[in-house]
Curated annotation (Swiss-Prot):
Protein's organism: Homo sapiens
Gene Ontology CC entries for this record: plasma membrane
Region listing for Disordered, in residue ranges: 1-33
PANTHER family found in the cross-reference section: PHOSPHOLIPID SCRAMBLASE FAMILY MEMBER 5 (PTHR23248:SF25), PHOSPHOLIPID SCRAMBLASE-RELATED (PTHR23248)
Gene: PLSCR5
Family designation: Belongs to the phospholipid scramblase family.
GO BP field: plasma membrane phospholipid scrambling
Pfam family, one: Scramblase
Name under which the protein is recorded: Phospholipid scramblase family member 5
């Protein structure tokens, strides 16, 4: 009796797939070699196949269609009038912080290269783990010098390149391209002819490669006269489809940092 119960328990083990043969019954030998080859070539169940995983730390980005970036006010820079390392809070639509970004650069570059300085921005999650690294080399920022324009390298996780943000030469409009790890164009970003804001928001449209369809925008929010004149603290919003690839969203976060350096870092530029 005990042996029969043990056999029944073995037959009901949860590890067997529905419709799988009884392990106590031997499979009939096939006399046709073709049938044996067909059995060996059967695909594995989907539960055993490797799944495409997101870069660690970017899982939360897959749920967002609005990402808010808030630059922290540096009191020391306000008092002394010096350029300090930028710090940013990255939040969801509810204002909850999901990431924190800190600029790494040397004082010499901040003093003498100003907004053109080379730097590295390290983005960490709320546990302090670095999830995105943004590298910015020293480049030009002029429509009169189209050979050495701005470029960012996006790594997620650190050490793994997932994309680039590159400036494209245009005599009238600020234009940028988001590229994948192979430097293939994915999306374009087109800004307005005048980026000073004039007491309002400044929108950079996110478009398809042919620039015929707008799928989102990156907005620099006007923070008010006092804040924009006396501080360099800026607020940005990234509006994109929620199902957009998380590595592209990470590149857009890097693009916000680049726009801040290029167009809004000086106090009067935000007006």
């Amino acid at each position: 009796m005990a042996s029969k119960d043990a056999q029944n328990q073995r037959r009901g083990l949860p590890g067997f797939l529905p419709g799988a043969p009884d392990p106590d019954q031997s499979l009939p030998a096939s006399s046709n070699p073709g049938n044996q080859a067909w059995q060996l070539s059967l695909p594995l169940p989907s539960s055993f196949l490797p799944t495409v995983s997101l870069p660690p730390g970017l899982e939360y980005l897959s749920q967002l269609d609005l990402i808010i970036i808030h630059q922290q006010v540096e009191l020391l820079g306000m008092i002394l009038g010096t350029e300090t390392s930028n710090k940013y809070e990255i939040k969801n639509s509810l204002g909850q912080r999901i990431y924190f970004a800190v600029e790494e650069s040397i004082c010499f570059n901040r003093t003498f290269c100003s907004t053109l300085r080379s730097c590295t921005l390290r983005i960490t999650d709320n546990s302090g783990r670095e999830v995105i690294t943004v590298n910015r080399p020293l480049r030009c920022n002029s429509c009169w010098c189209p050979c050495y324009l701005q470029e960012l390298e996006i790594q997620a996780p650190p050490g793994t390149i997932v994309g680039y943000v590159t400036q494209k030469w245009d005599p009238f409009l600020p234009k940028f391209t988001i590229q994948n790890a192979n430097k293939e164009d994915i999306l374009k970003i087109v800004g307005p002819c005048v980026t000073c804001g004039c007491f309002g928001d400044v929108d950079f449209e996110v478009k398809t490669i042919n620039e015929k369809l707008t799928i989102g925008k990156i907005s620099k929010y006007w923070s008010g006269f006092v804040n924009d004149v006396f501080t360099n603290a800026d607020n940005f919003g990234i509006h994109v489809p929620a199902d957009l690839d998380v590595t592209v969203k990470a590149a857009m976060i890097g693009a916000c940092f680049l726009f801040d350096f290029m167009f809004f870092e000086h106090s009067l530029a935000g007006l």
